[in-house]
């Protein structure tokens, strides 16, 4: 039973007074920054390129205000997340979001104005004013986007239209989370319960096939019923992506999305090529699942139930000890920051009524790299802890070693830091496993994670690319078109006939990531790169571990592929993917041998 917020032990809550001591301090800062933005609006547009000094002054002021806006937003959103029922912090978050929008509108002049400068004048100013070199990579990235930046007036119009462009995804979110009431279903205790998005995954992990089947059919009956509405929101969202790409003179929505993070399209293509080549491994794993479960007619609702009965329990204190022990492999510097996270209350540990579900790592440049958890004492919670700690260590190292302008990192790099930790935890637990049953459970856990992250997210990425291409070619994305396409791709990946699994054709309708604009492929590349890097960290040299820390410290001071190359990964080559699939095959082979021994019985 979840507690009220005030019943949680203080040491298990995050300390947000390290951001602002009081709410009044936050409110005063909000008022001050609003005034500062109003002043900027009156004084700075039209003057960016008056001189080298003007370029430096206006740039530094913009970055300083951005830094303060981020800090305000982080406090408001985290206060809201700890108890979403509190109207005060809902209002704070709305005000902070509005401030972000205002910041975007006020500084809409910056990029179009900057891009009026010639490379010759820019290089001359760089030679004259040493401090401009601090921002050279930022300016270089702007020059790289020059062909895609519009006039100041057009940029301001686009910024103002931001809320309209967000409406398809917001409509989906409200409809899917607030308006839709899912059916009642039976749980393992034969009790009728309300099916929710939150409890669906646990029902799909049930050992009782009847429970799984009923929950699965109940969920997808909803998506079948409202398929035309979901198709319309997704179609409109795809049109927004394609329109924005066209407005900015990109060849496609995918090119626009990847160029925004300076990721070459080749990375996406190399991933898809490797995935298609290794689909027989997934088919082999599905066949093994059939054998272990003793089901000849395996269905999509049989994919998620764990194959092991072993019940790992970790209380939080044990989880902390294990995380510290596992992550000590990175050396003294990393170990010290992990210790600080646990001792200085960076982590909000327990579930409470009204608290946001799930887990994340957050914070801003000027704050601790906070983490939100909802600890339930499972093996997954331990993996979540080291995962979020990976993000937080990435943030802490970046902020300590980079100025604000380069003090963040793209999602493309973020998922590598978190899942490297998960892979090292798996390696450690496998090494420590006492018997075949433990080993069987851990191998199953890792193989399922790989399937769910590398194969499944690539399946989503393939569907996402195809629907954007179809819309651009004039195809109408009706529910019939989307159902047919999704069913076909799902069959290709899982080798389970679409006609035997009719409900799965509606799965596209429930995936929020299809509204994120070519985002999901990064989960697959991230997990594969992390698998490759974890092997280097665990089995490699001190130099390999040092190179990994260099990647964590680099932030966005170079292009993403240059940053991850510091750790030893070439994302345009299939090498890291081949190594990841090789490990998948080795662990799958080991699981097959354990099954031959009857360990699963």
Curated annotation (Swiss-Prot):
Top-rank EC class of the record's enzyme: hydrolase
Q: Which UniProt keywords apply?
A: Hydrolase, Metal-binding, Metalloprotease, Protease, Zinc
Residues annotated as binding Zn(2+) are 387, 391, 394
Q: Which CDD domains does its entry note?
A: M3B_PepF
Q: Which residues form the active site?
A: 388
What are the recorded GO MF terms, alphabetically? Answer: metal ion binding; metalloendopeptidase activity
Q: Which cofactor does it need?
A: Zn(2+)
The EC number(s) given in the record are: 3.4.24.-
Pfam families cross-referenced by the UniProt entry:
Peptidase_M3, Peptidase_M3_N
| PROSITE patterns associated with the record | ZINC_PROTEASE (PS00142)
* Binding note for cofactor: Binds 1 zinc ion.
Please name the Gene3D superfamilies in this protein's record.
Oligoendopeptidase f, C-terminal domain, Oligopeptidase f, N-terminal domain, putative peptidase helix hairpin domain like
GO biological process terms held by the UniProt record: peptide metabolic process; proteolysis
InterPro entries linked to this entry: OligopepF_N_dom, OligoPept_F_C, Pept_M3A_M3B, Pept_M3A_M3B_dom, Peptidase_M3B
Instruction: Please give the function described in this protein's UniProt entry.
Output: Hydrolyzes peptides containing between 7 and 17 amino acids with a rather wide specificity.
The record's similarity note reads: Belongs to the peptidase M3 family.
**What name is this protein filed under?**
Oligoendopeptidase F homolog
